[in-house]
Amino acid sequence: MAESIIIRVQSPDGVKRITATKRETAATFLKKVAKEFGFQNNGFSVYINRNKTGEITASSSKSLHLLKIKHGDLLFLFPSSLAGPSSEMETSTSVGLKAFGAPNVVEDEIDQYLSKQDGKIYRSRDPQLCRHGPLGKCVHCVPLEPFDEDYLNHLEPPVKHMSFHAYIRKLTGGADKGKFVALENISCKIKSGCEGHLPWPNGICTKCQPSAITLNRQKYRHVDNIMFENHTVADRFLDFWRKTGNQHFGYLYGRYTEHKDIPLGIRAEVAAIYEPPQIGTQNSLELLEDPKAEVVDEIAAKLGLRKVGWIFTDLVSEDTRKGTVRYSRNKDTYFLSSEECITAGDFQNKHPNICRLSPDGHFGSKFVTAVATGGPDNQVHFEGYQVSNQCMALVRDECLLPCKDAPELGYAKESSSEQYVPDVFYKDIDKFGNEITQLARPLPVEYLIIDITTTFPKDPVYTFSISQNPFPIENRDVLGETQDFHSLATYLSQNTSSVFLDTISDFHLLLFLVTNEVMPLQDSISLLLEAVRTRNEELAQTWKKSEQWATIEQLCSTVGVQLPGLHEFGAVGGSARAATSAMWACQHCTFMNQPGTGHCEMCSLPRT
């Protein structure tokens, strides 16, 4: 019997097969490895396990058989210059996924929570099919795995995409425990550092050439549901279109929670919509540079929120008397245009999903896309989507273009002297019913889209207070709705609740307090944000006694709006408030002057 065996050795440059024998010593085997990979004898290390345990040393006189290395085993080679396996190697087993991915990254709280859950679908005893006692189990009542396709297909409505954590359980299940599986991010670029030839376009080899991509409909999704906390959040966003007829754009701020309708599912809960600077028309949107973007993210983080997605309108009135809108996005046209898919892919690349199971420390994205558009009943509907990881890679590496005259089609770029683009294919059915492979020039974008259910809760949730006279939303100057101290004074005069926290708990108001140019409170508002986040009235009362709120009151009193409830929110005594109410602001330099003076103490100009 021949004792020759083949051992696979994985390095950062790929996997190679080494022919050896069972009785061969470790030193002899390592010499073969060094020759095959082009290393010096001491320029690398070989391990049995990916986490750098079980090193095979040249000083060992043991045979491969005694080292329990069998035919077909996979060993791991690390050059001496590499600090660790996580920078280049792929993930393998379920234990290995945790140890050999990116152990230093901190995943989102929802991912940490779901990774510890059982996830199995428990079923009760079937009185007709089960023939055992109440404590027994059979094939009709044994718990199902969270990725069971038959169970997902029989839900109402059926679930086409399993959750991401269910997908992880599927990869790490089975006899091999995911030994040959890797959460690998797709790359469409030529690998750098290949010294065997001239750089592109003068040379390329199979070592540095990216693989061709065959588009498949993604079987899993990173987010399974989008839920707006209440109708007011969405209605205020739609008010812009109702008043102007122009399309509008916004960022969704909220949190990720467990979606219990799907095994190990994730829900994106939307608490507020921030509207950045933009130019909208009836059929187009242009985003402008937002100097406040980082500040908004910081304030949201202190409120326990984060940017979870983006939303835009695509609404056209059909009958203004009935209040109906046109039903334009359907199976006969498109659900997302190629341009929107590229935009969604760009947003998802900017907001990657932190994942310790990937060598890169991230895999996919939980950033969602919401569209306010007409439904089959000609009423406004909210639809949710993501684009696949393949689409993210094509967008990130600038390989995908939109089609100008066909919004439902994209176009994979062709290679040029400046950029190599791998071939992109998709599978289709021809007129004879045969499955054929087509080059993605053009490409139906339906291969890139993942649909997500979008809902409103039966019992509304309110992270922020709801007012009959809310504070104006930012960047709506075109409507005559501006954020200034006059609008703040008007808001305070119309909201005279005795609970200060209810009055101040408005996302757009808090942003104004931080970002206004007259009296920005970015350095002194942390206590108030903590009060809003925890719904703590005592903390809010403590903050309202600060000098900052007293100054805000003084500025509001100079705009000519009576604040009947000002005494409830003031931070000083009654006599001080009386003196403050008599102070006046110079119309020329805004200096606050003492009562009884007719000229400004700062610029000496008359009061009127």
UniProtKB/Swiss-Prot annotation:
Family note: Belongs to the NPL4 family.
GO cellular component: cytosol; endoplasmic reticulum; nuclear outer membrane-endoplasmic reticulum membrane network; nucleus; UFD1-NPL4 complex; VCP-NPL4-UFD1 AAA ATPase complex
InterPro entries: MPN, Npl4, NPL4_C, Npl4_Ub-like_dom, NPL4_Zn-bd_put, Ubiquitin-like_domsf, Znf_RanBP2, Znf_RanBP2_sf
UniProt GO MF annotations: ATPase binding; K48-linked polyubiquitin modification-dependent protein binding; K63-linked polyubiquitin modification-dependent protein binding; protein-containing complex binding; ubiquitin binding; ubiquitin protein ligase binding; zinc ion binding
CDD domains, sorted: MPN_NPL4 (cd08061)
Naturally occurring in which organism (per UniProt): Mus musculus (Mouse)
Function: The ternary complex containing UFD1, VCP and NPLOC4 binds ubiquitinated proteins and is necessary for the export of misfolded proteins from the ER to the cytoplasm, where they are degraded by the proteasome. The NPLOC4-UFD1-VCP complex regulates spindle disassembly at the end of mitosis and is necessary for the formation of a closed nuclear envelope. Acts as a negative regulator of type I interferon production via the complex formed with VCP and UFD1, which binds to RIGI and recruits RNF125 to promote ubiquitination and degradation of RIGI.
Domain of life: Eukaryota
Protein name: Nuclear protein localization protein 4 homolog
N6-acetyllysine PTM sites in chain numbering: K179
Gene that encodes it: Nploc4
